[in-house]
C-alpha cells in the first residue's frame, strides 16, 4: 500500500535542461522543449524519434559499490559528451522532480529511511525491504525520465546506477539476513513485470573498487550512519555486480570496467566510449513506431509505476486502508499537489482558466 503513494506523481515529469558545460552543443537539440504531451497525432504529423538521434544519443550508466566515485565520473562523461547527467535516484526523487520540488516528509516518501537501514538493517519494522522497494520504484521513474528526455530531444543521458543494477542491493540484503525470502520473491515479480517494457543502456561503466578501499573512503567521508556498513554487505554487493550483473549486461550492451585509479581519468573513459561499436542489444531493432510506443509509456508516469504495486500481502510494505486514506488526503493538501501540474494557483501557476 505504501508504494501506491508513488503513483501520486504527475503523469508527466518534463525533462530538465542540458548538462552544464556541454562541449558538443552543435549536435544537440537546444530549443525550448515544448511541454505539450507527445501522442499519436504528433507521430503521424512527423515527430519522428529517429530524426533526432545521432551518435551521442545514448543511455550510459555508471555503476559501482558505495563510495566508488560514480557521481564524479558520470558528471565528467556527461560534460565531455554533451549529455544530460542524472544523479543517483534517492528516496526523494519523485518529490524533488514534481510539485514545488521540495523534499517531502518521510510519510509521503515510502515511510523508509536510508539512515535507519545503516543503523539497524535488521529492524523488525520492515524498513530494509521498504527502502529497497521504494528505491527500485524511484530508479524506475528516473529511468523513464531519462528515456523520455533522450527520445524527445536526442540528447544522450548518463545515469548513476539504474533499474538493471538495483538488484545487487537486494541480493546483499538477503544474503546478510536483512530481508525475508518473501521480499525477494515480491521484488523479482515486480522486476519481471516492469523491466521488459524498457530498453537497456547502450553502455555500462563499472568502477571496480576493492572492499577495503571502499571502507576507507566511507570512513574518510565521515557519514556516521554509512560508517556502520559491514564489509560482508559491501562484499555481497561486489559479488552481485561481478557474478550476475556484468555478465548479464554484457549480452545486451557494451560494458567497460575500470579500476579506481583508471576511473580518475574521465578523458580516457570518454575516448573508450567513443570507440564502442554498439553492435548488440535491442536498440538495433527499434524503428519510429517502437520508439513511439516507448515514448507513450515513459511520458505517462502513472503507467510507468503501475506494476510496482501488485496484489500481494507483504507486511513490510502494507498499511491499513484508513491510514492510506489519511496519507493520501494529507498529500493532496501539500502545495502544488492538489491538481495536475500547471493548475495549482498556490504555487504560482497562471492562466489556469485558459488551459
From Swiss-Prot:
Keywords: Acetylation, Electron transport, FAD, Flavoprotein, Mitochondrion, Phosphoprotein, Respiratory chain, Transit peptide, Transport. GO terms for cellular component: mitochondrial inner membrane; mitochondrial matrix; mitochondrion; myelin sheath; respiratory chain complex I. One of its GO terms (molecular function) is NADH dehydrogenase (ubiquinone) activity. The modification N6-acetyllysine is found at residue 122. Phosphorylation at Ser-250 by PINK1 is required for the binding and/or reduction of the complex I substrate ubiquinone. Acetylation of Lys-242 is observed in liver mitochondria from fasted mice but not from fed mice. GO terms for biological process: aerobic respiration; mitochondrial electron transport, NADH to ubiquinone; proton motive force-driven mitochondrial ATP synthesis. The modification Phosphoserine is found at residue 250. The keyword Transcription regulation does not apply. It holds the Pfam family dNK. Belongs to the complex I NDUFA10 subunit family. Accessory subunit of the mitochondrial membrane respiratory chain NADH dehydrogenase (Complex I), that is believed not to be involved in catalysis. Complex I functions in the transfer of electrons from NADH to the respiratory chain. The immediate electron acceptor for the enzyme is believed to be ubiquinone. This is NADH dehydrogenase [ubiquinone] 1 alpha subcomplex subunit 10, mitochondrial. It comes from Mus musculus (Mouse). The lineage of its organism: Eukaryota, Metazoa, Chordata, Craniata, Vertebrata. The gene is Ndufa10.
